[in-house]
Amino acid sequence: MKKNLTELVFILDRSGSMQGLEGDTIGGFNAMIEKQKKEPGEAFVSTVLFDDQTEVLHDRVKVSDVQPMTEKEYYVRGCTALLDAIGGAIHHIGNIHKYARNEDVPEHTLFVITTDGMENASRRYSARRVKEMIRRQKEKYGWEFLFLGANIDAVETAGHLGIAPDRAVNYHCDSEGTRLNYEVMGQAVSAVRCSAPLDEHWKDAIEEDFRKRQKSGRQ
């Protein structure tokens, strides 16, 4: 494996229910990437946008070469084909690693999945198949998967996909919640890139915000 090289895969919801949060999503993502450019080590970035279709915005682009996302790429529409986005990305990255020389395979692989609603439009992949794919990559190759969900039970949904409770978190799908998501996401990515242990506390800030606003009734 290639030391100090990380495979980063971002799977981002852009279905119709994300309307009104385009600017926050674009700004949060771009700020996170800019911070990653300053981190030590190398990284490849893949970004998959999904609604009822899947669009690959970045396909293993060196983090230093990633251009800012704009409203031309991130615009909301359609339904939520979450399983197709996850399954397609795992298949693609898995094949690249499978046929690469061992010394070229990244030391770390991290998938970050964000969605603000229930799966309702996938045609190619089932939950059972995606769960098996995730299990295999985690057990055999040590891949990490983080799941950030709004308007659903994120822990339960992630569990159906084989993602552990300590790797899933509920968030408020608004401007404040979206900004916090990308801030925390960036911290988790930095930890993985420098081989620091990613414990259950990676999501504390998001959980605190979610509980506080849920308790006060402020959405």
Model-derived features: where do they sit?
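Acidic, low-complexity intrinsically disordered regions
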Residues: M1-Q219
